[in-house]
Regions:
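Membrane-interface helix-loop junctions and terminal tails of multi-pass membrane proteins
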Residues: 1-160, 164
Length: 166
């Protein structure tokens, strides 16, 4: 189904954050079913599923940017119109806000039971274990660069019909 690209980015980013923040909340908050259950495997698998579903939903309509860094990287590389950037940024921002809010509302009773502020914060964002602004910035820069580089590389691949053996 093709939809408006801004709506697609909004829905895709909402889906991404709802699943992503939701699984982190489910693993880390008090009295949840998955509390303490091999968090790294569960969180990684669920975030991978969240990305897959979000890209699947939005790829035909908006290109599945789902992240302002991807939108900016594609615009800088000349693969995306600058006139669409502000709308994509807004759709992604509001989608992220709605997805996070929906995850919060889903687990609101568990948030109320959880007293550790770092665990609560960790359901919505990451933070450095060691605060060093230079190293923390460099780490985020490299991670974002690799994400955008991967998306740009994938955008160069032309998928053709499979070769038939006959």
């Amino acid at each position: 189904m093709i939809m408006d690209p801004y709506l697609a980015e909004f829905i895709g980013t909402t889906t991404l954050l709802l699943f992503g923040a939701g699984v982190v909340a489910n693993v880390n908050l008090k009295n949840t079913i998955a509390e303490g259950q091999n968090p790294w495997v569960l969180i990684t698998a669920a975030w991978g599923f969240a990305v897959f579903v979000s890209v699947f939903i939005t790829s035909q309509s908006s290109g599945a940017h789902l992240n302002p860094a991807v939108t900016l990287g594609l615009a800088v590389a000349g693969k995306f119109s600058w006139s669409l950037v502000p709308g994509y940024f807004c759709a992604q921002l509001f989608g992220a806000m709605l997805g996070s809010w929906l995850a919060y509302i889903t687990y609101i009773d568990h948030y109320r039971l959880t007293k550790d502020e770092e665990i609560i914060r960790g359901t919505f964002c990451t933070g450095p274990a060691v605060r060093n602004l230079k190293n923390n910035f460099f780490s985020e820069f490299i991670g974002t660069f690799m994400l955008v580089f991967g998306v740009l590389f994938l955008s160069l691949i032309h998928i053709s019909e499979p070769t038939r053996p006959y």
